[in-house]
């Protein structure tokens, strides 16, 4: 049999090779959720156990079971750090990956998940079976620091030093 390529798919198959007995075999397959088939080879299977019964022309019977498995789900756990100052580029996005089949390849669409400025970044994960998972992260930044002039007191005489400016800031 051929197991499932990606978690949740139904592309498994079982190919029987029947030898021995007396020709004109009949095959019966049963499985989970009422699965039933009378073909020798079965396709588009989901992960499950499939029981077969083969009967030859002399009514001799052979039975057994085949298990079709699937890879674990691709899981990405995201840890992000936002930009520390407005206009900066020190945001980060780090993925901890598990599941799938073989090595998981991370693609951030040309971006490096370090030294990020504010914005939304999308990633795509691909395993050895070409199974795909994707997601995105939004990196934020604090608002810009602004100085607000609350009031101005002019100097009283030319070249004087008794003027005052009162300010407040935001951000």
Question: Can you say where each PLM-predicted feature lies in the sequence?
Answer:
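Proline- and Ser/Thr-rich low-complexity, intrinsically disordered segments
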Residues: 1-171
């Amino acid at each position: 049999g051929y197991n499932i390529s990606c978690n949740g798919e139904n592309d498994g198959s079982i190919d029987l090779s029947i030898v021995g007995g007396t020709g004109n075999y009949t095959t019966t397959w049963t499985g989970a959720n009422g699965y039933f088939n009378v073909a020798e080879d079965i396709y588009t299977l989901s992960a499950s156990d499939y029981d077969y019964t083969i009967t030859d022309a002399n009514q001799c019977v052979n039975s057994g079971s085949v298990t079709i498995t699937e890879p674990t789900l691709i899981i990405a756990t995201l840890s992000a750090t936002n930009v520390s100052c407005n206009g900066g580029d020190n945001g980060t996005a780090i993925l901890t990956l598990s599941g799938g089949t073989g090595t998981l390849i991370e693609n951030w669409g040309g971006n490096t998940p370090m030294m990020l400025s504010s914005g939304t970044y999308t990633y795509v994960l691909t395993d050895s079976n070409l199974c795909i998972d994707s997601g995105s992260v939004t990196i934020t930044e604090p608002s810009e620091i602004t100085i607000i002039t609350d009031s101005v007191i002019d100097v009283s005489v030319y070249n004087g030093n008794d003027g005052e400016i009162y300010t407040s800031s935001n951000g």
